[in-house]
């Protein structure tokens, strides 16, 4: 960085969003067309407890793709992750205390950005 600054270059440094360590499983049921992400689901036949998720029933209002007429999005928050009832205990043990992408968290919503300008 020192050599770059000596030449008068400005540096813009950024990175991808982060991950979230998950440790709380939430049961969700979806059909065969439901995506496999552990922190968000999109589908037309989702079954879940609406008090445990952030749900979006009108994706177009939020700029999200509308995969079919009745698409619903649900997002995990905090340290939650989604698990299906079949083999529930296996998946809970397998994914508990792992780092996952997706969902609603500071790590997922904020993208770090810094601009370094050399002193004159």
What are these regions (language model features)?
Residues 1-120:
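Feature captures the catalytic ectodomains and active-site-proximal regions of enzymes
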């Amino acid at each position: 960085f020192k050599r770059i600054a000596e030449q008068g270059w400005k540096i813009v440094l950024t990175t991808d969003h982060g991950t979230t360590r998950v440790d709380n499983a939430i049961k969700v049921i979806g059909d065969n067309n439901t995506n496999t992400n552990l922190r968000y689901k999109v589908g037309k036949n989702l079954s879940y407890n609406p008090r445990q998720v952030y749900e979006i029933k009108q994706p177009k209002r939020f700029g999200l793709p509308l995969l079919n007429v009745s698409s619903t999005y649900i997002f995990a928050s905090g340290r939650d992750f989604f698990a299906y009832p079949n083999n529930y205990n296996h998946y809970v043990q397998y994914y508990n205390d792992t780092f996952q992408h997706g969902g609603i968290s500071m790590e997922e919503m904020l993208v770090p950005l810094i601009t370094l300008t050399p002193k004159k």
